[in-house]
Amino acid sequence: MVIAFVGWLISVRKVSSATISQYLSGLRMVHLKRGMMPRNLRPDLVKTILKGHSNVDTQSKAPRLAMTFSVMKLLKNLLTSSNFCLEKKRLIWLVSCLAFHGSFRIHELLSRNELSYDSTTTLLGMDIRLVKTKISGVNEEFLIVHLKSPKEDSLKQGVNIEVFSTGTLTCPVQAWHKWLKVRKSTPDPTKPVFRQKDGKCMTGSSFNKDLKGLLGQHIDYDHHKFLSHSFRAGYASMMAAAGYPDAIIMRQGRWHSEAFKAYCKTGRGSRLKEQRDLARKLALHCDKSS
């Protein structure tokens, strides 16, 4: 029975070996909660099947590449020349700039479903705001993105991420202004902030599909691909290539809860200078290497 279930998951559902293992663990837990001792759900034959399926997954899966400034420029040009409506063009670009400079996981920004959402985890209109203030005597603008359910275990009370203007092509604050201008209204505080013109939520899946449709004109996705996580990985990779120490890279990307605590201890003025200098240095590094 277990072998038939595993075979169905592989041949019909097309799920990975890791996902099948999670399903088997969940199945075992259901039995235990109902007071039943489950039989061995991973006999030697199942283990062999899963190992073989894992090897196939590894061989067939195209490697995911880290985003770079050069590819961001290409994405911008492709969006400009695409057949998308102007609002969608600017929405995709805004999400790209935020994911890139804020090192966000894509579902920290986007909903998982087009027609439904969980208000306790999804980024709503009330969870992102533009702040104008003086920092070191200079008028500045930045976005505060409130994550209600961050991945880091010890930060379940929610965290505020500040994303500053960079003065570069990929400036997230400028992208925010341009999106609002074409949208002609502020996001509904009680609904997902990033919704398309038809009212449907932009999802991580639809965002990846749009990325592939655009970048796939120049990149063979059968051999390597850019997906939503490429933005988060890209900033870290470029920081490493530019010589930034591991501690700053970890802090910028909130790679674990201790890194975020270090982020919080850094003053706002210091974070602004650090993010802006970082963006300009990496953009310059990209121009020199291209």
Locate the predicted segments by residue:
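Extended, non-catalytic subsegments within catalytic or DNA/protein-binding/adaptor domains
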Residues: 1-290
